[in-house]
């Protein structure tokens, strides 16, 4: 494995609804042989519990991540994950000298968007995203709020102008809308596309109507 491949992607999960998007993105990165640095906000842990019934604990993060992915705890793919607590401002991703390749915030709340856009850094997720921007590394913000206020739209524009990719959690139904997981994978796959990571999460449009659906 090259030194470039060993550089991790930071995955930040904020408190927005959309835990399955984060799970699919993490699984896609690990299946691609990538290393992952995981940051879960305090609000995200509440959302994860509400949406999945799984209590994500700092002290048992590997067990809980395996449960979210529906993998065995012993799965060696999990060895590529490093977990950082949301309040750890001494963590690797808080520094520009840390060799992260980039970051995806999935899903992103309006509050996270606001904090990142003004460099608030109220927790490690926001700090890591701000560092990613200042170091000119890829930052993908998968915003999952509706409707969007004028203030949030302005903040998203600021992030876009600073170099971030703004990726609304808007699935393409041509990928096969009869399956919720297919719609989840579509959004996660678009996030990985924005990072430049190869994956097989989504069926790509080929110009042939019905081809993606027929692939099921």
What are the language-model segments listed below?
Residues 1-139, 147-216:
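A cross-family phosphate/adenosyl-ligand binding-site feature
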